[in-house]
Amino acid sequence: MGLKILVFVKQVPDTQNISGNAMTPEGTVNRAALPAIFNPEDLNALELALQLKDRYNAEVIAATMGMPAAAEVLRQSLYRGADRAVLVTDRALAGADTLATSYTLSCCAKKIGGADLILCGRQAIDGDTAQTGPQIAEKLNIPQLCYVEEVKEIKEGKITLRRAIEGGYEILESPMPALLTVIDCNLPRPVNVKSLMKNKRAKTKSEIMGEYKNDPTAAEAEIAKTAAKGLLIEEWSAADIEADPERIGFAGSPTKVKQVQSVILTAGDAKTVEPTADAIAELMHELISDHTLG
């Protein structure tokens, strides 16, 4: 495989189902209290990577940072066609903001090495900052191309793509390696049955150890068996990626979230307007006067 594509994906809390205990006293999201889903725009990034795999016979690596349960989004990535999966998990990574997260993921990218393209969703729905992708690019000192809709061509070490801008789009060319953030621009493919059957037993070392917690010998045997079948999801700690302890997790995060809540917009007073030019003109004047418009 000539082209190597790294896709950073994320398991996020379903922010449409915020409960009363969604925040910890320290100001971080209590992920255990919320249903977990595959971050939507990361699915778009994965789909774009898989389209490039189909076109250029690329290798697609899915990687994520999170709790051990985040291995599920990696399995979902394998089911859709990713070739390899990496989980970066460590208690020291908990409470990370975008600064600490991007540093950790840049360390992960360096350990994987050799990626021609790094793809991320534009933003994660649990933060809506759109900061992590560009920050990774800055830390890796590679070009960043944001709001990508389509890859036109990859040729002679350069990528030509289309990205959305306000009021239209632009066509850009960039040298590789480069990082792309991808918007909701495609329809992510469903799980591939063949890939599902192949990877349904893909697990991390921690998951296997948990299943055989009373029998370490059997656990080691199962780990070796899973690895031999190519089904062991790689699992790295902060030390494995050589991350600076002062720059990760809560310790490396200057941002603290005070509160997360679902906001439901409801109608207040209602006013019926006659479908005449004078009535509509009067309504427009009223809306402009109270600064609802303009």
Q: What function would you assign to each model-found segment?
A:
Residues 1-294:
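N-terminal glycine-rich FAD/FM-binding segment characteristic of electron-transfer flavoproteins
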